[in-house]
């Protein structure tokens, strides 16, 4: 049996609130409910003594989390409807709905895009991504909608991954951001890494920071509404939360994004207003350029309609 992994954390002088909430903010890999379960099992301690999920965090205190040996996750086929944009023997392009997780993970063992793909493709997916990520070449966030390409065999997976690696994939996202951008177009070029204060979040970091990765987002204004701006973003790189962090870093977070934007989110959006609209690449088998366009989903068009009405009033 493998030894248990330990996570050791020290609360800063300004740490406050419930301990389970504070720990969840420090550990990107553990949800609050998972931490509560570990506390009930006596796996979270302070100074060698077990803590309670209702305890308050103590500034300056050292906490230790003993993680049990992880149980293997095996993705199972599930008959979940898919919006298939294109499909052949080598790949499949999907229009992912908002709210769907791409692949299984602790806390999301099923109901994911991978579960749906395993059923739809009858197991014919590339194995390079491993048992829980078959066919997955790239990902988008749970609350981001839009286009994704998945590989059905290893040759297609390698060819698509190579294109992502040299940033030759065409990817355009549509978004609505808070505020009125001063220019009609521009770009954000930074390095991104984990936020040291909250491991679930990404942030702009110095180039020399541990884990720093280069990120470039180009943007142009499509429509202005005074307090909001409708934009198109073209990605050169595809880092975790890239558009969300980049737009927030210049003072224009995405509408509905309660993580990187205002706490008072827009309930009708159920998360950030971000849609992966265009996707283009060289087909691995034919070597021909193919490009796909996804119509804006209902949540996006309804919010646009509302903004247009309010702006004209």
For each of these PLM feature ranges, what is it?
Residues 2-313:
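RNA pseudouridine synthases
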């Amino acid at each position: 049996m493998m030894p248990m992994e330990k996570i050791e954390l020290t609360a800063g002088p300004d740490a406050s609130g419930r301990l389970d909430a504070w720990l969840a903010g420090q550990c990107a890999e553990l949800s609050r409910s998972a931490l509560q379960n570990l506390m009930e099992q006596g796996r979270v301690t302070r100074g060698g003594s077990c803590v309670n999920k209702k305890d308050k965090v103590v500034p300056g205190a050292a906490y230790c989390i003993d993680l049990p040996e992880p149980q293997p996750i095996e993705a199972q086929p599930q008959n979940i409807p898919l919006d298939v944009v294109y499909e052949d023997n080598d790949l499949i392009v999907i229009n992912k709905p908002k709210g769907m997780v791409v692949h299984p993970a602790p806390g999301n063992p099923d109901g994911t895009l991978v579960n749906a793909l395993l059923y739809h493709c009858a197991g014919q997916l590339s194995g390079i991504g491993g048992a829980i990520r078959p066919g997955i070449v790239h990902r988008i966030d749970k609350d981001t909608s839009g286009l994704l390409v998945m590989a059905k065999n290893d040759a297609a997976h390698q060819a698509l991954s190579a294109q992502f690696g040299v940033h030759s994939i065409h990817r355009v996202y549509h978004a609505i951001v808070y505020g009125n951008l001063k220019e009609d177009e521009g770009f954000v070029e930074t390095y991104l890494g984990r936020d040291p204060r909250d491991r679930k979040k990404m942030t702009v970091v110095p180039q020399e920071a541990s884990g720093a990765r280069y990120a470039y987002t180009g943007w142009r204004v499509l429509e202005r509404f005074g307090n909001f701006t409708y934009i198109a973003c073209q990605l050169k790189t595809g880092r975790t939360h890239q558009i969300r962090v980049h737009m927030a870093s210049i003072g224009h977070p995405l509408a509905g994004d309660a993580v990187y934007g205002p706490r008072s989110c827009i309930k009708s959006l159920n998360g950030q207003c971000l849609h992966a609209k265009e996707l283009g690449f060289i087909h691995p088998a034919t070597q021909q350029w193919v490009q796909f366009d996804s119509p804006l989903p209902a949540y996006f068009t309804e919010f646009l309609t509302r903004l247009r009405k309010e702006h004209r009033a």
